[in-house]
Amino acid sequence: MYFIGLDIGTTGCKAAVFDETGACFGRCYEEFDIICRAPGWAEQSPAVMWDAVTHVLKESVAQAKAAGMRAEEVRALSTSVLGEEVMPVDGDYRPLRDAILGMDYRADEETKLLTGAVPAQRIYDITGFPPHPMGSLPTILWMRRHEPELIPRTYKYVTFTEYVMKRLGAREGVVDHPQAGRTMAFDIERKCWSDELLRAAGLDRSLFCETAEPGRVVGNLSQEAAAELGLTEAVALVAGGQDQTCAALGAGLIDESIGMDSHGTIEGIGVMSSKKITDERALAAGVSCYAYTIPGRYFLMSSSQVGGLLLKWFKNNFSLAEEQEARRTGRNVYDVMTERAPEGPSGVMVLPHFIGSGPPWNDLDSRGAIVGLTIDSTRHDVVKAIMDSLTYEFKINMLYYEDMGFRFKDIRVVGGASKSPRWMQLKADILNRPVSTLREKDAACLGAAMIAMCSMGAYPSCEQAVRACVKVDRVYRPDPAWTGAYEAAYRKYTHLYDSLKEFNHIKIPGGTV
């Protein structure tokens, strides 16, 4: 039996074909660009995304066939999809505009209108979503206020989950509970859309799709999709999860002693929880709480607004020499950049708030900064400062989770950074905790595929699927030679935001400095 995990992210999508042991027989990735039509805006073309989806599915299936798989052996496909994105579609599921992404903050005023109608703590108690412009609900209100001509043509507001599943052959658009939990409109205890919040927003429940537990079969591949992908119509389409929850399952988070460092375009900490946590302290810290890929469990997450995106920004603007060397030698440009970074704490520090700050400050007006530069500083020092500072941000949130009672025996890293031994050792030294990487680097694809496995009866539970399929590749342990120096640097870093806050909030023509 074979199972397909499809992972749609912020800047690209990938697909992977696994057997029931978690062995991968084909994979493909395709990148796409974020559309930025104005400062602070971020959109994605559903047409570009769909073309990428069909390409990665076809290519991964072709690779698996070349390795001996037969089309009729593929049992099911499930999805892992970025959260918060939303777009209106008509009755034929044709998009009426590009999707607005979660990193788009244009709906700040609409968020304030919602919290004026329903107190922030009440919204958080219902949805587990700290009120924020990234939520789908305030974004929908922005569309209705600024693009009213679309209202009469709108059949549903959907994420990429419903859109892709419908185009693949699902009977109707269905959104899984973890993904619905990223809309700021879903009641995470009752597992349905919140009538209270929809009334406050002036929206009818009929504008939203049906919701489903991860693992529910929502249809089968259509004849057209099966022919295009080289599969059969017998392939079941299985409700999956939001990308962070699928990555967490693929990283083996089946108890509360394992934390996840999801380090891709953005970086965040995630942990499985046996109980809902939406108290005042968690709200103040910006902790998201929503449905996990294991029914009856919750997923807690705190995300920075950047991660690998910040290193990409530096590469695009300052690393021409490293790009040329990477092309000449056939190496990854980020490996070239990070290997030249000096050892030990950088004398330079970066405040990585280039798109505002995430938890625990949750300050949209905070801005990025590079401090501590001298005439002797080089771009390699700044690269190291980016690596250090992103890890300091993660540590602040990790320690908050430990204050809540979580005791991490292991931090498992997923995403692009997990492929860098240099960065993994740095994380272990700064966090002063064991840090692990996984045999299967595409954890979100594996997580989605394991949901499909359980749905088809390959395993009686996700926990058993994890024990069979998830394997730790390498454990990085803190180096005592560096932990003390990094702890001292971390303590200095914790003062950086407050030191720059007043300056960052000065309004000048053209925006916020």
PLM feature segments, named:
Residues 30-31, 102, 305:
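A generic structural motif
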Residues 22, 45, 77, 104, ...:
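Residue-level signal for inorganic ion chemistry
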Residues 22, 95-117, 121-123, 379:
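Glycine/GP-enriched mid-protein hinge/lid loop-to-helix segment characteristic of carbohydrate kinases
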Residues 68-71, 80, 205, 253, ...:
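Alpha-helix termination/capping residues and helix-transition junctions
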Residues 64-102, 130-134, 165-187, 210-213, ...:
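Short beta-strand-loop/turn "lid" adjacent to the catalytic site in phosphate-handling enzymes
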Residues 3-5, 17, 115-128, 132, ...:
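Active-site core segments that coordinate phosphate-bearing ligands/cofactors
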Residues 1-98, 125, 226-227, 231-236, ...:
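N-terminal glycine/serine-rich phosphate-binding loop of ATP-dependent small-molecule kinases
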Residues 87, 109-113, 247-249:
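Pocket-flanking alpha-helical
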